[in-house]
């Protein structure tokens, strides 16, 4: 099942590569808002997914979980040397990542929530803004990592992009404490604290 207007426009623009699941459609028309949530499989995106589902239960709207992906070598590399089997493999991997993220977040239980999922080909910020195009939509994102000035230059913030460009409200769900601790371990701070504590 798909809902007409917005999805059709996305398909015509080549953004939507695959619709995965749709649970209990109770008439979310194209003019009714949805909660669009960016999913990557990270702890932050899983926290955003939980926030989106809780808000959907409260407001009785549909959740659209979106995982954005690009072909290996990004779009420019793929345009230079197109290879349809590589594109298909990239899309299939994105679909598998999205299913895995949903399974990790909810163990297959979406109790009372209308949920649709899409793997969308394109740059993350731009694609999420395009998906959250209805009046009344709400875009929910995980706050992401604190990369520092150089990291932000190399990998600009998806959240900042969406806040600047989205036509709807954007909610940035704070990183869960476990994610902050894991990032500290990756940078070596946590290891030093563990050694100093013993």
Predicted regions and their residues:
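Small/aliphatic-rich secondary-structure junction motif
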Residues: 8, 26-84, 165, 179, ...
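Glycine-rich, Arg-bearing micro-motifs that act as flexible, cationic patches
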Residues: 139-161, 180-182
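Short, flexible loop segments at boundaries between secondary-structure elements
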Residues: 163-180
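Structural beta-alpha unit
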Residues: 1-31, 44, 106-139, 177-184, ...
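General small-molecule cofactor/ligand-binding pocket signal
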Residues: 64-66, 116-120, 171-173
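A short acidic, glycine-rich active-site loop
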Residues: 83-97
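Active-site phosphate/pyrophosphate- and oxyanion-stabilizing loops and adjacent acidic/basic residues
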Residues: 103-104, 160
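Short secondary-structure boundary segments
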Residues: 67, 143-144, 174-175
């Amino acid at each position: 099942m798909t809902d007409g207007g917005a999805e059709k426009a996305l398909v015509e623009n080549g953004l939507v590569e695959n619709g995965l699941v749709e649970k209990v459609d109770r008439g979310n028309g194209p003019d009714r808002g949805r909660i669009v949530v960016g999913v990557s499989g990270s702890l932050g995106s899983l926290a955003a997914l939980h926030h989106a589902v809780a808000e959907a239960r409260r407001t009785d709207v549909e959740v659209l979980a979106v995982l954005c992906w690009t072909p290996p070598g990004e779009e420019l590399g793929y345009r230079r040397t197109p290879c349809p089997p590589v594109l298909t493999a990239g899309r299939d991997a994105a679909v598998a990542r999205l299913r895995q993220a949903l399974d990790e977040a909810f163990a297959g239980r979406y109790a009372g929530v209308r949920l649709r999922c899409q793997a969308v080909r394109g740059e993350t910020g731009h694609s999420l803004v395009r998906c959250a195009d209805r009046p009344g939509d709400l875009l929910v994102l995980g706050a992401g990592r604190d990369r520092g000035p150089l990291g932000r230059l190399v990998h600009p913030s998806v959240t900042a992009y969406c806040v600047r460009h989205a036509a709807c409200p954007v909610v940035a769900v704070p990183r869960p404490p476990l994610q902050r601790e894991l990032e500290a371990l990756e940078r070596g701070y946590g290891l030093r604290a563990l050694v100093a504590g013993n």
